[in-house]
Every structure is written in C-alpha cells, then in structure tokens.
Amino acid sequence: MKMKKSKFILVPLLLFALILNTIPAFAASSESAAVAQDAEGRKLNTVTITFKPSGLTKGVATVYASASGNVEYIKIKITLQEYDSSSGKYVNSPGPSYSSYAPNKSSLYYTHTFDLSAFKTYRIKVDVTSSGDGVTQTETLYQSLS
C-alpha cells in the first residue's frame, strides 16, 4: 500500500520538476533568439586541411571549406610558417600568403605548392572566412607537414 502512495506522489512531483526546467527556455528575449538563429543559420560547416610533402623540397597544401546559410563569400588564406628553435615558436616564413576568394559561393577548394628547405620544420596557418547578412566568421587552423 505504501508503494502505491509513493508512486501517486512521486509522478506529479517529477512532472512539476520537468515543467520548472523548461521555463527558462521560454524566457529568452526575441532579439537574442534572432541573433542566435542567424549565427546558427550561417556558419562554416566543414574545413578540411592537408599539408603533404612532395619530394624533398616541396609541400602541397590543400584546403576545402564549406558554409551554410546565406553566404556572400568564402575566403581561404594560407600562410607558411617555420619553426624557430631559438624562440620555440612557429613564425611566418618570408614570402607572401596565398589566398582564394569565391563570391556568392558556399564552398571553396584551394591548393598551393610551397618551396621548402629540407632542414626546417614547417606548418601552415589557414584562415577561413565566410560572410553573409553582414556577419563575418573567421576560423584559424594549423596543419603540420606530414
């Protein structure tokens, strides 16, 4: 008999607790909800990076990026970096960065071959930028030569 009474009280208490947990979800302002929806609606979906050796003195960097939503442009910028043993950090190598820009596209594939020294340690720094509805999103990623 005690078991039935405790179930009779426990079930309404659990339902009440569930209802209390959902109240804060409805308390968000419509403005913050609209901003969150916009940021979620237009975002970088996929960024794939490879940096592979090609012979002894070349490295091939390949980047694929895609974004969803209302995309005005997508841009990839690749910067070669080399390890500086005196500072223990990677620094930008002498020479330019290489970029590709695609207006009104939601994806972009870009590849570039870098000249390398056999006696240095390299990686690439990749900046991927997408823009839409006046909001710009940039991700910076790194890939070591492998």
Region spans (language model):
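Bacterial N-terminal signal peptides that target proteins for export
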Residues: 2-11
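Bacterial N-terminal signal peptides
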Residues: 12-21
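Sec-dependent signal peptide cleavage junction
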Residues: 20-37
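Short, surface-exposed binding/anchoring microloops in extracellular/periplasmic proteins
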Residues: 41-80
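Short beta-strand segments and strand-loop junctions that repeat across beta-rich extracellular domains
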Residues: 77-89, 125
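Solvent-exposed serine/threonine-rich low-complexity stretches and specific carbohydrate-binding patches
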Residues: 78, 89-104
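Short, solvent-exposed, Trp/other aromatic-anchored flexible loops in extracytoplasmic proteins
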Residues: 97-125
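Short beta-strand elements
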Residues: 134-146
